[in-house]
């Protein structure tokens, strides 16, 4: 990471310097007005705008020009300073992965050098927000073309309700042609629940009891924009279920698998679930039940461990309202709320 301080008579000029020296990917850590001695004896101090900005070194431009008081501050490996102890313990106490925490602590000398004093608290919050955003990936808006989405996950994560929310969102907002498919003929009422949604949204519902059935259903509805496939919820420890699931996922080359993870799951159990479902190709995560907890650290840790993209967030039972496309900004805000830093 590079941190630099820029000084200018006006904010617009300071921001222009930031963009020229560090590129459009730079993030502003702090801004303040400072008084500098006049270059001429006896004249009053002059006021300037001071902006401290940061950039990941991979994004830094090759320009040789710098701000008015440049400092590369390339981060060197070092042991945590004694003064960083309280911050280190605060971050570790949240359950964050030690690797991520120690990576943050390594940046503190550079951050403190350029943002010391009253602006340090603001800079630290902005820095954490930026590092969280830099550490995760999101799937982004759905592109054009036929999509076949399979929702998988353990019992109780909300697969059927999430499928209904997605169906309603794409039908009502994007006017997509959608076919619902369920593989869940085991759970009492599962088909009836989906049939209710299908009738309300005026879209077909198909049942596929075997992989060959799923293949035939898709072939019958090739004019559709989107297939949404509900699966049986089983324990991640059920190896037989996972092997059966793998057979369904080979019936069409455009199948995309989305793993649902509940925000109420403990960190260790979440890691175990993801490890067990790694036997199938997962396109993205969907985080559910965000409204049922205030601690999102386990979810963020999972994004750090696997670097899988996040596609959607759900935060309630209402269909279709309680679902949204995941964004880096949203996830960063959720996590900082966990730290009580917002």
Residue ranges of predicted features:
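Conserved beta-strand/loop subsegment of P-loop NTPase cores
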Residues: 177-179, 254-261, 278-293, 297-315, ...
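Switch II (G3) loop of P-loop NTPases
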Residues: 154-155, 178-189, 196-214, 218-241
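Non-catalytic terminal/linker segments enriched in charged/polar, low-complexity residues
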Residues: 1-138, 144-145
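Conserved lysine of the Walker
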Residues: 159
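NTP-binding/hydrolysis catalytic cores, primarily Walker-type P-loop NTPases
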Residues: 9-12, 21, 78, 87-91, ...
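Hydrophobic anchor at the beta1->P-loop junction of P-loop NTPases
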Residues: 149-151
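Inter-motif core of Ras-like GTPase G domains
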Residues: 219-227, 240-265
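Hydrophobic positions on the alpha1 helix immediately C-terminal to the Walker A/P-loop
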Residues: 162, 166, 193
């Amino acid at each position: 990471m590079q941190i630099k301080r820029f000084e200018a008579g006006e904010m617009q000029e300071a921001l222009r310097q930031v963009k020229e020296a560090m590129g459009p990917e730079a993030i502003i850590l702090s801004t303040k007005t400072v008084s500098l001695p006049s270059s001429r004896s006896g004249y009053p101090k002059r006021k300037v705008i001071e902006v401290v900005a940061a950039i990941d070194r991979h994004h830094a431009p090759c320009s040789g020009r710098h701000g008015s008081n440049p400092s590369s501050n390339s981060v060197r490996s070092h042991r945590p300073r004694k003064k960083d102890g309280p911050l280190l313990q605060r971050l570790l106490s949240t359950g964050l992965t030690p690797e991520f925490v120690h990576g943050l602590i390594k940046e503190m000398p550079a951050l403190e050098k350029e943002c010391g004093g009253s602006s340090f608290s603001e800079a630290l919050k902005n820095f954490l927000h930026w590092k969280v955003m830099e550490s995760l990936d999101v799937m982004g808006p759905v592109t054009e073309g036929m999509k076949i989405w399979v929702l998988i996950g353990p019992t109780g994560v909300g697969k059927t309700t999430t499928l209904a929310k997605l169906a309603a969102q794409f039908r009502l907002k994007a006017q997509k042609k959608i076919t619902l498919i369920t593989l869940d003929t085991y759970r009492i009422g599962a088909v009836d629940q989906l049939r209710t949604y299908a009738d309300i949204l005026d879209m077909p519902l198909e049942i596929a009891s075997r992989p060959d059935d799923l293949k035939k259903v898709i072939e019958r509805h090739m004019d559709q924009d989107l297939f949404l496939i509900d699966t049986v919820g089983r324990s991640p420890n059920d190896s037989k279920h996972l092997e059966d699931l793998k057979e369904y996922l080979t019936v069409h080359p455009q199948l995309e698998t989305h793993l649902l993870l509940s925000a109420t799951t403990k960190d260790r159990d979440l890691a175990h679930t993801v490890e067990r479902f790694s036997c199938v190709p997962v396109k993205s995560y969907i985080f559910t039940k965000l409204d049922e907890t205030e601690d999102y650290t386990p979810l963020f840790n999972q994004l750090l461990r696997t670097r899988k993209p996040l596609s959607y967030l759900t935060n309630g039972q209402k269909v279709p309202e309680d679902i949204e496309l995941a964004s880096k900004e949203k996830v960063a805000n959720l996590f900082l709320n966990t730290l009580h830093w917002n």
